[in-house]
Swiss-Prot record:
Binds 1 zinc ion per subunit. Gene3D superfamilies: HUPs. Catalyzes the ATP-dependent conversion of 7-carboxy-7-deazaguanine (CDG) to 7-cyano-7-deazaguanine (preQ(0)). The gene is queC. Zn(2+) binds at C190, C203, C206, C209. Pathway: Purine metabolism; 7-cyano-7-deazaguanine biosynthesis. Disulfide bonds: none annotated. One of its GO terms (molecular function) is ATP binding. ATP binds at C8, S9, G10, G11, L12, D13, S14, S15, V16, I17, A18. Keywords: ATP-binding, Ligase, Metal-binding, Nucleotide-binding, Zinc. PANTHER family: 7-CYANO-7-DEAZAGUANINE SYNTHASE. It comes from Methanopyrus kandleri (strain AV19 / DSM 6324 / JCM 9639 / NBRC 100938). Belongs to the QueC family. It is an enzyme of class 6 (ligase). This is 7-cyano-7-deazaguanine synthase.
C-alpha cells in the first residue's frame, strides 16, 4: 500500500489537494501540518485537522521554529500582515525558504516511514498554483520539477512529488474542489480569522479574503465561507 503525505496548511488549496490525494492516489493519506511559528498557526492547525477528518485522512503536526528565529521581523511572525485588500506585496508574504522547509519535513516523514518498513511507495502532495507562481519563485512548476528530481535522487524512500494545482488559478481550484466534493468550507484563508462554534469566520476585508471571495465568484460556485464583512 502506498503512503501519501499532503502538506496541509488549512487553507483553501489544502482542502482541495487533500481530497484529491484521497480520490486519486488512495492508500494511506496523512495530512501534515507544519507549525513554523506563523501568527495564525492555531487557526490553521485546527482547520487542517478538520480537513483531514473530513476527507478520511490521518493527521500529523510538526513544529519547526528556526525560520522564526532567523527572521523574527518577517510579517508572517510580527503581526503586520496587510489589513486592507490591495496592500499586499511580495515583502509581506515572502518567508525565506519556507517551501524548502515544508518539503523537507514531508520528505523526512516519508523516509522515517520507509525505514520503519511501513511502506515502500511514497507520495508528497502540495498546493502550488499558477496564481502564486506569478509572484513566488518557489511556487513555479520549474521549481517543483527540480525538487521532484532531487527527492528521487536524494532519499531512500524516493517519494514522488505531485502538484495537482500547478496549472490552475484560484477559480479553477474552486471548480476542482467543487467537483471533488472537497471540504472548502472548513478551510481558513483569512489573515485575521476567528472561530465561532468550531467554524472559521473570515474578516472579509484582508487581501486573502478578497482573493477567496473573487475565486468563488469567478468560478460561479456558491461561497460557503462565513465572513464578518
Amino acid at each position: 500500500m502506498a503512503t501519501t503525505v499532503v502538506l496541509c496548511s488549512g487553507g483553501l488549496d489544502s482542502s482541495v489537494i487533500a481530497k484529491w490525494a484521497v480520490e486519486e492516489l488512495g492508500g494511506r493519506v496523512i495530512c501534515l501540518f507544519v507549525d513554523y511559528g506563523q501568527r495564525n498557526a492555531p487557526f490553521e492547525r485546527r482547520a487542517a485537522e478538520r480537513i483531514a477528518e473530513a476527507v478520511g485522512a490521518e493527521f500529523e503536526t510538526v513544529g519547526t521554529f528556526w525560520l522564526r528565529r532567523l527572521c523574527p521581523d518577517n510579517p508572517m511572525f510580527a503581526g503586520r500582515l496587510p489589513r486592507e485588500a490591495g496592500t499586499e506585496d511580495l515583502s509581506a508574504n515572502w518567508l525565506p525558504a519556507r517551501n524548502w522547509n515544508l518539503l523537507g519535513v514531508a520528505a523526512a516523514l516519508c523516509d522515517h516511514l520507509y525505514l520503519e518498513g511501513e511502506d515502500d511507495e511514497f507520495h508528497i502532495v502540495w498546493g502550488i498554483n499558477a496564481e502564486e507562481a506569478e509572484r513566488f519563485p518557489d511556487n513555479t512548476k520549474e521549481f517543483a520539477d527540480a525538487v521532484a528530481e532531487a527527492l528521487k535522487r536524494g532519499l531512500p524512500s524516493r517519494p514522488r512529488l505531485h502538484s495537482p494545482l500547478a496549472e490552475l488559478y484560484k477559480p479553477g481550484i474552486v471548480r476542482l474542489g467543487s467537483e471533488l466534493g472537497a471540504p472548502m468550507e472548513l478551510s481558513v484563508s483569512c489573515y485575521n480569522p476567528i472561530w465561532e462554534d468550531d467554524t472559521p469566520v473570515h474578516c472579509g476585508e484582508c487581501e486573502a479574503c478578497y482573493h477567496r471571495k473573487r475565486a468563488f465568484e469567478r468560478a460561479g460556485i456558491e461561497d460557503p465561507t462565513e465572513y464578518l464583512e
